[in-house]
Structure formats: C-alpha cells, structure tokens
Amino acid sequence: MRESSQIRETTETKIKLSLQLDDGKNVSVRTGVGFFDHMLTLFARHGRFGLQVEAEGDVFVDAHHTVEDVGIVLGNCLKEALHSKEGINRYGSAYVPMDESLGFVAIDISGRSYIVFQGELTNPKLGDFDTELTEEFFRAVAHAANITLHARILYGSNTHHKIEALFKAFGRALREAVERNANITGVNSTKGML
C-alpha cells in the first residue's frame, strides 16, 4: 500500500501525520485550528485518502506555523508514499463548485515544485484561521512534495465557500494524479523519470 507516516518537531510546532493513498477509510484531523481541520477533512474525503493529523503549534501567536508545517509534512508524506511514481497518471485536475463559488486545481507530479495561486479572499479571517494561510498551505505542500500545483478561485462571494471549493478540488485533482493506470508502463514521462 502507498502510505507514509512522518513527524516534524520544531520549537514552533509538533506535527504527526499519516497519509494513505489507497485507503480512504480513516480520516482524523486535530490541528487546534478548527477551520483548517474542516478543510483537511474535506480534502481527504473528496480525494478518498486516509489522513490522520495530530498537530500542536504556537496558535497563541497565530495559526501560520501550524498550517505551513502541516503542509510541509503532508507534502513529504505524499512524496514518500509515491516513491517511484511508476504507473500513475501524473496529471490531475478538477473544477469544484461550492454554491456560488467555483474552485479549480491542476496538479503535475513532475518532480519540480511550482505553484500558481490566484483568487481573492475578501474576508481576512474565518474563525481562528487567517485566510491568507490558504496559499501558504498549498505552497508548502507543493514545495515539499516536488509537485506543480495551480489553484484558482474563479469566482464567488463567500470566502468560506471559495476556500472549501479549493480544498475539495485539491483532493479530487490529487486523486486523479496518483491513480494507477494500467495503460502506463513505467513513469509517465518521455525522460524516463520524474
């Protein structure tokens, strides 16, 4: 089974995270940041991934370190769980509506980290979550996993709905990208490696 478990401990955070690419039955998220827990749960459910996250961070300052470090560990686990990348689609994309909002995510498991994030988040805070941390999370995942990730909010008026559409689209796009494809021999690249 393609899976990984890692721990990251710094003076700011302690993150314990497990990711299962082929078994989406067990999802449990506790980061101390309620809205972020909700988004990670949506990502896992809509991507059909198993995800267990336990995080302790300096949320008395703000949620930045917790959100970013969870992104780093998730990216590291994704990279380790995929290891050879043989037989996977490599590419994935998804449009996801959430009421009046529409989110889009495209992924290339390329071995090259790059991110493009576009979208206006008009409400600066949702509960204890600074909405600008949405981009920081995706940036951390992309860099740690060495993937190319494009995330775009096409339109919408409710900030919660916009971010929710992105996290669901991220799950669905990543599911497509990591899916095994019987028609692909080796890695899906003319270079012979990713």
UniProtKB/Swiss-Prot annotation:
The keyword Phosphoprotein does not apply. Its EC number is 4.2.1.19. One of its GO terms (cellular component) is cytoplasm. One of its GO terms (molecular function) is imidazoleglycerol-phosphate dehydratase activity. It catalyses: D-erythro-1-(imidazol-4-yl)glycerol 3-phosphate = 3-(imidazol-4-yl)-2-oxopropyl phosphate + H2O. Pathway: Amino-acid biosynthesis; L-histidine biosynthesis; L-histidine from 5-phospho-alpha-D-ribose 1-diphosphate: step 6/9. Gene3D superfamilies: Imidazole glycerol phosphate dehydratase, domain 1. CDD domains: IGPD (cd07914). One of its GO terms (biological process) is L-histidine biosynthetic process. It is found in: Cytoplasm. InterPro entries: IGPD_sf, ImidazoleglycerolP_deHydtase, ImidazoleglycerP_deHydtase_CS, Ribosomal_Su5_D2-typ_SF. Keywords: Amino-acid biosynthesis, Cytoplasm, Histidine biosynthesis, Lyase. Belongs to the imidazoleglycerol-phosphate dehydratase family. This is Imidazoleglycerol-phosphate dehydratase. It comes from Bacillus cereus (strain AH187). The gene is hisB.
